[in-house]
């Protein structure tokens, strides 16, 4: 697994785009040390929202 891109939203929220050994992309949505994985960007963003992230109030870093 390698990290292709990371977006930090502040307050411990982050979204990583990852690539596995087969070259497939997937996503890791995290709040601090708690992370969930998804094959789809939309689902990963939904995971962030489920962890309490509000896209209307995020600070893009």
Spans of features found by a protein language model:
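Short N-terminal "domain-start" leader segments
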Residues: 1-28, 35-36, 58-60
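Alpha-helix N-cap recognition
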Residues: 40-41
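Short arginine-rich
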Residues: 50-59
